[in-house]
């Protein structure tokens, strides 16, 4: 079964018409969004581009949960049935992540949309715990996983993952080698060495794609904070990072697209 996945930090969706048009143009079966507020949820639902929509604002929150401006949203076409699965007892995960079980005939997936704390302000104290908790939860999942994430990292997305640099060492539990899921862009590059060689020629220290520009104009640093990750065994046939298109539509993060082949 072939599946088209979109993952995007929509920055609250300040321009819903433009951002929804860009998403619609990609013909995604499943959409994983981050930094989603109630107005963005309404815009996605009212667009009727997807038949099923779930978001962190609808789910019960545990005591102590922080009500953030941005949550997460997962939407799917009519072929899929969505049921929430992320345990709400973990305060940090419940406020920054959304997980659902998605079924289509005999196929079943665990879908996650995750919005990691930044390495600045209050997020700096939360970041290590978030990645540790997420890695622990991922290790308990028995169904194949598709994860869309604004990880606000790594600090350096090196072509050799062993040379990537992290804001906190716990990031590697989710994003590094040996994690429960694999980066679809690195999987795609493994099967397209000529494309990897071309990228590394211009960016020998990374990033492997542009998804976010950190710093001030004129002195910005290209970063790849956004990614789609999958369980081993899920094949990747195409990956695209639509940075310029996403910025024109109203975000400051790339829209990440992946075409997957399920066994």
Please provide the spans of the model-predicted regions:
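Structured beta-strand-rich core segments of catalytic domains in phosphoester-bond hydrolases
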Residues: 30, 36-119
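Low-complexity, intrinsically disordered Gly/Pro/Thr-rich segments
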Residues: 235-246
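Surface-exposed cleft-lining segments at the edges of enzyme active sites
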Residues: 87-88, 114-131, 155-161
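Active-site beta-strand/loop signature of hydrolases that rely on acidic residues for catalysis
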Residues: 3-10, 19-44, 100, 111, ...
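Conserved beta strand-loop-helix elements of the APE1-like EEP
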Residues: 33, 66-84, 203-236, 260-262
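Short, solvent-exposed loop/turn segments at secondary-structure junctions
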Residues: 11-13, 37-39, 80-81, 105, ...
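Short proline/glycine-enriched turn/loop segments at secondary-structure junctions
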Residues: 63, 215-218, 245-249
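Metal-dependent phosphoesterases centered on the DNase I-like endonuclease/exonuclease/phosphatase
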Residues: 30, 44-46, 50-53, 128-232
């Amino acid at each position: 079964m072939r599946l088209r996945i979109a993952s995007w930090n929509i920055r609250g969706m300040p321009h819903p018409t433009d951002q929804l048009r860009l998403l619609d143009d990609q013909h995604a079966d499943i959409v994983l969004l981050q930094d989603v507020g109630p107005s963005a949820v309404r815009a996605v639902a009212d667009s009727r581009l997807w038949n099923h929509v779930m978001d962190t604002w609808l789910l019960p929150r545990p005591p102590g949960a922080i009500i953030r401006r941005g949550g997460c949203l997962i939407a799917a076409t009519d072929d899929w049935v969505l049921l929430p699965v992320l345990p709400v007892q973990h305060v940090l995960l419940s406020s920054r992540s959304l997980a659902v079980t998605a079924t289509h005939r005999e196929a079943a997936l665990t879908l996650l949309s995750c919005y990691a704390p930044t390495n600045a302000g209050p997020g700096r104290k939360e970041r290590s715990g978030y990645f540790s908790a997420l890695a622990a939860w991922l290790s308990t999942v028995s169904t194949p996983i598709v994860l869309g994430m604004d990880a606000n990292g790594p600090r350096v997305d090196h072509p050799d993952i062993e040379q990537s640099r992290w804001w906190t060492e716990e990031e590697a539990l989710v994003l590094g080698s040996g994690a429960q899921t694999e980066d679809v862009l690195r999987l795609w590059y493994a099967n397209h060495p000529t494309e990897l060689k071309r990228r590394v020629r211009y960016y020998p220290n990374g990033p492997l794609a542009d998804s976010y520009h950190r710093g001030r104009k004129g002195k910005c640093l290209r970063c790849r904070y956004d990614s789609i990750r999958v369980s081993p065994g899920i094949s990747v046939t195409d990956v695209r990072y639509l940075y310029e298109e996403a910025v024109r539509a109203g975000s400051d993060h790339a829209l990440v697209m992946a075409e997957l082949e399920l066994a």
